[in-house]
Amino acid sequence: MSHLFSKACQYFPGGVNSPVRACRAVNITPPIVARASKEVFVDSLDKTFIDFCGSWGSLIHGHSHPKICTAIRQGLERGSSYGLTSEQEILFAEEIFSYLGLETNYKIRFMSTGSEATMTAVRLARGITGRPIIIKFLGCYHGHADTFLQEKPFSHTSLETLDLAHPLTLSLPFNDFPLFQTVMNSLGHKVAGVIFEPVCANMGVILPVPGFIEGVIQTCQQTGSFSIMDEVVTGFRVAQGGAAALYHVKPDILVFGKILGGGLPASAVVTPKDIMDHLAPEGKIFQAGTLSGNPLAMIAGKVSVNLCREQGFYTQLATIEQNFLSPIEHMIRTTGIPVTLVRYGSLFSFFFNPNRPNNLADAQLSDIEAFQKFYQSAFSKGVYLSPSPFEASFLSAAHSMESLDYAQTALIESLEQVFSLV
């Protein structure tokens, strides 16, 4: 254990301020970051890592992008927080509406975290419908509110005394539309909203089967329940317009975060006006935040989104993904090792399972011990993947060919080592 991490353990539970950072799922001592730039970070022991976590997908442009850093420095001279509506909020809202192609009958509410945004989405759904039940899907993560922490691996982090929240939340298997439809046929009149990730990133990368997302939204329309699409991960990453644009759907409520803040804390709820105007002060459903719409986060976010709009940005990202991951897929296929590499829109996951998972139960069939050995080998070579078998890793526009070539070789060698192919 490093000296700094030992000191961190004196002050923070588990030495961290968010559980997965402790790296217990991969059985390593977590690095303590000293600095970061582009696609790499350097730890307190002066070891350099190629970063495929990127602040959990927030840094699609890499660490310390010069345009974002310059904008933040200039903005800081005008103040770090006002507690009042700022010009920066309005300018950023205009940028988002233009980027997403939102119609004029939409509105947005800025917040600071994804958890705040999903909590607000659920509060809107319950407040407007007067119904108690929220449906989510097993393995999908929507923040740390008790409403969402119903099943393992999250339930142990929620106080047992708050189990009263659980009867108001139903968790169903992802991608099982017949079961979802059966439940909605029975309980739909009590369901305020259904929240879902369009592409799962918190049980590894799991894609929706054809028709699942569309079916969920259509069923919500039929029962008068709100469809809540959590695009905290996929928004601004998988395409301009996010997953909603890719799947050609219009959920009632959209939730954004991560990339939205350009590396600073920012999130947002986006809905048609007739939904959003139920929020205070226009309506009676309360939501507030001291740092909501923080001017520095708005500035960083505006630059981040503007960079995503540059000509060929997503084509470049797709090329990076293809060049980096295709040779690894080829190695897995030709050697016949029991590993499945799932990728989508610059997200990717290694499942130590010969079959592509469709839900949490499938993902949990993976060989966790083999994943740990693979992860430890890659880590020792200076390749930092997201430190859990059930978390997505991320590519960024900042990943250079040199870094990708090195990491590709390191990951293939690590797979060979785990399965004794060398």
Swiss-Prot record:
GO CC terms, sorted: cytoplasm
PROSITE patterns from the UniProt entry: AA_TRANSFER_CLASS_3 (PS00600)
Record keywords: Cytoplasm, Isomerase, Porphyrin biosynthesis, Pyridoxal phosphate
Coiled-coil parts of chain: none
Pathway(s) where this gene product acts: Porphyrin-containing compound metabolism; protoporphyrin-IX biosynthesis; 5-aminolevulinate from L-glutamyl-tRNA(Glu): step 2/2
Main location: cytoplasm
Domain of life of the organism encoding this protein: Bacteria
Cofactor(s) needed for function: pyridoxal 5'-phosphate
Top EC class, one word: isomerase
GO molecular function: glutamate-1-semialdehyde 2,1-aminomutase activity; pyridoxal phosphate binding; transaminase activity
Homology family: Belongs to the class-III pyridoxal-phosphate-dependent aminotransferase family. HemL subfamily.
PANTHER family in the record: GLUTAMATE-1-SEMIALDEHYDE 2,1-AMINOMUTASE, GLUTAMATE-1-SEMIALDEHYDE 2,1-AMINOMUTASE 1, CHLOROPLASTIC-RELATED
Complexes and interactors: Homodimer.
Name the UniProt record assigns to this protein: Glutamate-1-semialdehyde 2,1-aminomutase
Organism encoding this protein: Chlamydia trachomatis serovar D (strain ATCC VR-885 / DSM 19411 / UW-3/Cx)
Gene, per the UniProt record: hemL
